[in-house]
Curated annotation (Swiss-Prot):
Record-listed substrate binding positions: 115, 154, 236, 241-242, 266, 329, 376
Pfam families in alphabetical order: A_amylase_dom_C, Alpha-amylase
CC cofactor note: Binds 2 calcium ions per subunit. Calcium is inhibitory at high concentrations.
Organism: Schwanniomyces occidentalis
GO terms assigned for molecular function: alpha-amylase activity; calcium ion binding
Catalytic-site annotation from UniProt: 238 (nucleophile), 262 (proton donor)
Name of the molecule in the record: Alpha-amylase 2
Lineage: Eukaryota, Fungi, Dikarya, Ascomycota, Saccharomycotina
Record gene name: SWA2
Residue positions binding Ca(2+) 2: 238, 262
């Protein structure tokens, strides 16, 4: 690996006995307890305004095309924590919580939370500061974590960039805190990306001079206070690649928690270096080949397999990347395909891959909204069904992942071995030698079937269980495993010893 280790020689020797690819930790935040603790989390991302209302309504109108506040609140989230925890999630990621511009713009209202006006005030549409504290407290009572989305790149203005009234902002209330107005025109020019503005002249996004010490000092004091006041466990940073990289080291130190930066780029050579400045980044390099593989039955697994290898080579710590197949910026997977087998494979792959899994609210109900704003539906209109097949799948996959972590606290530090990658099937193996989980994914589709055999680290004749069907199998005498795929379903095999007395599949 290309980065330093904080493990002793003895520890390295021991780790090599139990894992084919032990993770080597960097000297800085990747090895800190704040970041390391997030490896074992499974995150449920939600849009606060669209998840749950205080009145508990399951019929309140919410037309996504109107781009208005629909009434979701912090209290609504609290009231539905059983629903989230029932899927096995251990953390939630909520929308930015600070005060937004109040205008009805050409793109609607700031219900999403990315159009800041005052970083010291809470968005009253979501509730009060006490409501947010209560949400944090209720999560921690359940041993769950709170991740809050934040924006450090820009504020917002209803209108042209040339007409911004900076005095309306708090605390950055002078033009001198912001870059001169210019829209981004060249995403291959990093200076243009960092110093010019996102947005347009309908809603302009005044770009902060985060490279200036006065701006960074204010943000550092603010984030330390935010984390302390609301007992926040992690932060997701919007538009991270648009902020000067020198801003992040002191900000990471001031925050003192896991930082997940949105680096909206599919090239690992561009995305991975951001781990030099913050704990983790959203895994867009994996997202694109994952989407292309699981959105239909025509693509082979070659591109996805190659990206897994590239991430291992280019990233400092793949176990701190945030993996996703849907989010608030991308069309939902069911907008590309209605094949439930493909969707289930994508969900299971996302949850079992190396890194921190993130599921976007509504995936468990099969929501199919395409681009923003259609992918920001009101979840209450689903009735919060717990009988949906996707809800049950997510629960089952999180359950085996959580069991693996319970049995071996180092499980999430191991890198997966690709046991098989050919045609339309990929098999991954992860964990210590005596507790390895083998996951088999495909894009054969609901009418597809195939039988594959590949080598594993299982002992000859070892009893294994597909935790998604509860069917028992045995490793072959030569330690290979024969897997029969029917109906294009994913398979996740665990040694019977791993799930003993867990309740999984009645063991």
């Amino acid at each position: 690996m290309k980065f330093a280790t904080i493990l002793s020689t003895t520890a390295l020797a021991l780790s090599s006995l139990v894992a084919s690819k032990p993770i080597f930790l960097s000297k800085r935040d990747a090895g800190s307890s704040a970041a390391a603790a997030w490896r074992s989390e499974s995150i449920y991302q939600l849009v606060t305004d669209r998840f749950a209302r205080t009145d508990g309504s399951t019929s309140a109108t919410c037309n996504t095309g109107d781009r208005v506040y629909c009434g979701g609140t912090f209290q609504g989230i609290i009231d539905k924590l059983d629903y989230i925890q029932g899927m096995g999630f251990t953390a939630i990621w909520i929308s930015p919580v600070v005060e937004q511009i109040p205008d009805d713009t050409g793109y609607g209202y700031a219900y999403h939370g990315y159009w800041m006006k005052d970083i010291y005030a809470i968005n009253s549409n979501f509730g009060t500061a006490d409501d947010l504290k209560n949400l944090s407290n209720e999560l921690h009572k359940r041993n769950m974590k709170l991740m809050v989305d934040i924006v450090t790149n820009h504020y917002a203005w209803n209108g042209a960039g040339s007409s911004v009234a900076y005095s309306n902002y708090n605390p950055f209330n002078q033009q001198s805190y912001f870059h001169d107005y210019c829209l981004i025109t060249n995403y291959d020019d990093q200076t243009n990306v960092e110093d010019c503005w996102e947005g347009d002249n309908t809603v302009s996004l005044p770009d902060l001079r985060t490279e200036d010490s006065d701006v960074s000092s204010i943000f550092n004091l603010w984030v330390a206070e935010l984390v302390s006041n609301y007992s926040i466990d992690g932060l997701r940073i919007d538009s991270a690649k648009h902020v000067d990289e020198s801003f992040y080291p002191s900000f990471q130190s001031a925050a003192g928690v896991y930082l997940l930066g949105e680096v909206y780029d599919g090239d690992p050579a561009y995305t991975c270096p951001y781990q030099n400045y913050m704990s983790g980044v959203t895994n867009y390099p994996l997202y694109y080949p994952m989407l292309r593989f699981f959105q239909g039955t025509s693509n082979s697994v070659d591109e996805l397999n190659a990206m897994i290898s590239s991430l291992e080579s280019d990233c400092k710590d793949i176990t701190l990347l945030g993996n996703f197949i849907e989010n608030h910026d991308q069309p939902r997977l069911p907008s590309y395909t209605s094949d439930s087998a493909l969707i289930k494979n994508a969900i299971a792959f996302n949850l079992m891959s190396d890194g921190i899994p993130i599921i976007y609210y509504g995936q468990e109900q099969g929501y199919s909204g395409s681009s923003d704003p259609n992918n920001r539906e009101a979840l209450w209109l689903s009735g919060y069904s717990t009988s949906n097949g996707y809800y049950k799948l997510i629960s089952s996959v999180n359950q085996i992942r959580n069991q693996a972590i319970y049995k071996d606290s180092k499980y999430t530090t191991y890198w997966s071995d690709v046991l098989y990658a050919s045609g339309h099937v990929i098999a991954l193996q992860r964990g210590a030698d005596d507790q390895r989980i083998v996951s088999v994914f495909n894009n054969l589709g609901s009418s597809g079937s195939q039988t594959v055999t590949f080598s594993t680290k299982y002992s000859g004749g070892e009893k294994v269980v597909d935790v998604l069907t509860c069917q028992t199998s045995y490793a072959n005498s030569d330690s290979t495993l024969t897997v029969s795929i029917s109906g294009g379903a994913p398979r996740i095999y665990a040694p019977a010893s791993l799930i003993a007395n867990s309740g999984i599949c009645n063991f």
